[in-house]
C-alpha cells in the first residue's frame, strides 16, 4: 500500500509497468470524451452527486478525495521534464490534469457544455463555470460592439 500512496513517482522507463500504466492513463485524459466517460460512468470519483445515491455516503466522499489526491500526484510529476517528454500531446494532457485539480471543474465536467469547451478553445475551458452575470455582461458588450460598428 505504501507504493500505492504515490509519494515517489516511478522511474521514467517504458519497461516499468507502473510507469507505462500511469502514462496510458494520463494520455487518456487528453481526450475530453474520456473525461466525460469518467464523469458519467464513475461520478463518485469526481465528487459528482447523483440523485440515485445517498449524498452523505462516506465511501463516495472518500473515493472522490482519494481520486483527487491521485490526480494531484500525477500532475505533480508528469509536468516534470523527465516525464513530459513521454507525452504525445503534452499541452492537452497537462491542461486536463491541471483542470482536474479544481473541484469545481471535476463537478462541472459532467455537463456537455464543458466537454464542448474542452474540445474548443483554451479560454473557454479556463472559464468553464461562467456565471449568469458574466454571460449577460458579455452579451451586452457584444451588442454594444455590434451597434457601434453599424453606426460607423
Curated annotation (Swiss-Prot):
Signal peptide: none annotated. Residues 126-144 have a biased composition (Basic and acidic residues). Transmembrane segments: none annotated. One of its GO terms (cellular component) is mediator complex. One of its GO terms (biological process) is regulation of DNA-templated transcription. Pfam families: Med31. Keywords: Activator, Nucleus, Transcription, Transcription regulation. Its main location: nucleus. Residues 126-152 are annotated as: Disordered. The keyword Transcription applies. Belongs to the Mediator complex subunit 31 family. Component of the Mediator complex, a coactivator involved in the regulated transcription of nearly all RNA polymerase II-dependent genes. Mediator functions as a bridge to convey information from gene-specific regulatory proteins to the basal RNA polymerase II transcription machinery. Mediator is recruited to promoters by direct interactions with regulatory proteins and serves as a scaffold for the assembly of a functional preinitiation complex with RNA polymerase II and the general transcription factors. Component of the Mediator complex. PANTHER family: MEDIATOR OF RNA POLYMERASE II TRANSCRIPTION SUBUNIT 31 (PTHR13186). This is Mediator of RNA polymerase II transcription subunit 31. It comes from Coccidioides immitis (strain RS) (Valley fever fungus).
Amino acid at each position: 500500500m505504501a507504493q500505492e500512496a504515490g509519494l515517489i513517482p516511478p522511474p521514467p522507463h517504458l519497461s516499468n509497468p507502473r510507469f507505462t500504466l500511469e502514462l496510458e492513463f494520463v494520455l487518456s485524459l487528453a481526450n475530453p470524451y474520456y473525461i466525460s466517460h469518467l464523469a458519467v460512468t464513475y461520478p463518485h470519483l469526481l465528487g459528482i452527486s447523483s440523485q440515485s445515491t445517498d449524498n452523505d455516503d462516506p465511501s463516495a466522499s472518500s473515493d472522490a478525495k482519494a481520486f483527487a489526491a491521485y490526480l494531484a500526484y500525477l500532475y505533480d510529476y508528469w509536468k516534470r521534464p523527465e516525464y513530459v517528454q513521454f507525452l504525445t500531446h503534452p499541452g492537452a494532457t497537462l491542461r486536463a490534469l491541471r483542470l482536474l485539480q479544481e473541484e469545481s471543474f471535476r463537478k462541472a465536467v459532467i455537463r456537455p457544455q464543458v466537454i464542448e469547451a474542452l474540445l474548443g478553445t483554451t479560454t473557454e475551458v479556463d472559464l468553464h463555470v461562467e456565471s449568469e452575470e458574466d454571460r449577460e455582461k458579455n452579451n451586452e458588450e457584444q451588442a454594444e460592439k455590434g451597434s457601434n460598428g453599424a453606426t460607423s
